[in-house]
A protein has these predicted regions:
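Ligand-binding clefts/hinges and TM-proximal coupling segments of bilobed small-molecule sensing domains
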Residues: 57, 63-73, 146-218
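Pocket-lining segment of extracytoplasmic ligand-binding domains
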Residues: 5-7, 14-17, 46, 82-174, ...
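Extracytoplasmic/secreted envelope proteins and their assembly/folding machinery
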Residues: 27, 50, 68-75, 92, ...
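An extracytoplasmic/periplasmic, membrane-proximal ligand-sensing/linker region
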Residues: 94, 101, 111-129, 139-146, ...
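Short, glycine-/small- and polar/acidic-enriched structural segments
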Residues: 1-54, 59-62
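N-terminal targeting leader peptides, primarily classical Sec-type signal peptides for secretion
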Residues: 48, 76, 238-241
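Structured segments of extracytoplasmic/periplasmic soluble domains
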Residues: 4, 10-14, 18, 43, ...
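A generic structural-conservation signal
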Residues: 2, 62, 84, 108, ...
Length: 241
């Protein structure tokens, strides 16, 4: 199945949304696919930094969702608690409409960039993308190994003239630990041997690479996937060590 790389880490460790159910180790990583970018945006030109969110109404995604925990990580790194803002638990579409209607001041979205909701708002009303960088980003990267640095290129959204610094998790494929090695090997080969063909049909396919597949993964790889990567000169962890 498909999962954010941070969410699979929560499941493996039995934390956050998986605290009640406890840790589960019955799955393995096949590989990372593309960036699920943490995007913080506003229509208010006076909100320029994460710290400027204090006292503001901010959409942080549905409670216990991947977006919610990503937003918490950013806020916490900026010294902001939920008591310091007016949190709103909205979907991407509702975040867009609430910004447009002036009901919220800023929103977090975690998805591949460009994201339709942000593109639509940038086209009709204009948006400001807020950088997640400096000490805040350094703190997050230090504490949470499933995040990596990311730069949203200039021109990704209408009116976005400068690149935006942020962080990302990855859309990841996981498989059952009991799936046989040959099947997982063939699945891995089917994706990465045909990356160019996939990219011709879907823009996110341009991010498919063996480097993206194997970096930022905190959960052990399936032996079948590991065999494929080894044939291409990449050694991955299959034991959780």
């Amino acid at each position: 199945g498909f999962v954010q790389s941070d969410v699979m880490a929560y499941a493996w460790d039995g934390v956050r949304a998986f605290e009640q159910d406890g840790a589960t180790h019955d799955f393995r990583t096949l590989g990372g696919l593309y960036a699920e970018t943490v995007q913080l945006f506003t229509m208010d030109p006076d909100i320029k930094t994460v710290e400027d969110l204090k006292g503001k109404s901010v959409s942080i995604g549905a409670a216990n969702s991947g977006v919610y925990f990503n937003a918490l990580d950013v806020l916490n790194a900026g010294g902001i608690t939920l008591d310091d803002i007016h949190p709103q638990y909205l979907s991407f579409e509702d975040s867009k409409e609430s910004l447009k209607d002036g009901k919220i001041d800023a929103a977090f979205i975690v998805a591949g960039a460009p994201t339709t909701a942000i593109t639509e708002l940038a086209t009709t009303n204009g948006v400001y993308m807020i950088n997640i960088d400096g000490a805040i980003r350094d703190s997050i990267l230090s504490d949470c190994p499933y995040y990596t640095s990311y730069q949203i290129p200039a021109g990704t959204y209408p009116g976005q003239d400068e690149p935006v610094e942020t962080i990302t998790v990855k859309a990841t494929i996981v498989v059952s630990e009991n799936l046989d090695d040959d099947t997982v090997y063939d699945m891995t080969a089917a994706i990465f041997d045909h990356a160019d063909e996939i990219a011709s049909e879907n823009a996110k396919g341009e991010e498919l690479s063996l480097e993206n597949a194997t970096t930022g993964m905190t959960i052990p790889f399936h032996e079948g996937a590991a065999r494929y990567y080894a044939e291409h000169g990449i050694t991955v962890d299959t034991k959780g060590e």
